[in-house]
Amino acid sequence: MSSSVTDPTNAQNTASDAVAASTVDKGKGKSTEIADESMESVDDEEEEDDDDDDDEVEEDDDEEEETFEEIDPSAILPTGRRTRGVRVDYTSKEALAKAGLTGNEHDEDDDGDTEMN
């Protein structure tokens, strides 16, 4: 004798009944699961907790004042013009005079015609 607990045919029927109860029949091969609202309420509670944490972080940002200790004010151009993209000619007479050089100087290392005995 078998009881309803140990009867294999009874276990199959209860499993298929549970699947049928959790889905809505929409036709052949098209079924939609019934939403489990207990999981959604847990997600909502977590989102509310996350929002509280964000507010605390934003308050900290508001309290901090920006200091310009790292920025050298003398490096800021008063006209607001930018120096990027400006072509500089280092070979012009004006640039050489500013550096204290003349255009005829040669480096000793660059001479390739020097013979060594």
From Swiss-Prot:
Task: Cite the record's Acidic residues compositional bias ranges.
Answer: 34-72, 106-117
Residue ranges of the region described as Disordered = 1-117
Keywords, in A-Z order: Chaperone, Nucleus
How the protein assembles, per its UniProt entry?
A: Forms a heterotrimer with H2A.Z-H2B, stabilizing the association of the histone dimer. Also, with a lower affinity, forms a heterotrimer with H2A-H2B.
Is Chaperone one of the keywords?
A: yes
Q: Which InterPro entries match?
A: Histone_chaperone_domain_CHZ
Q: What's this protein's name?
A: Histone H2A.Z-specific chaperone CHZ1
**What is this protein's function?**
Forms a chaperone-bound H2A.Z-H2B complex that acts as a source for SWR1 complex-dependent H2A to H2A.Z histone replacement in chromatin.
Q: Where is the composition biased (Basic and acidic residues)?
A: 86-96
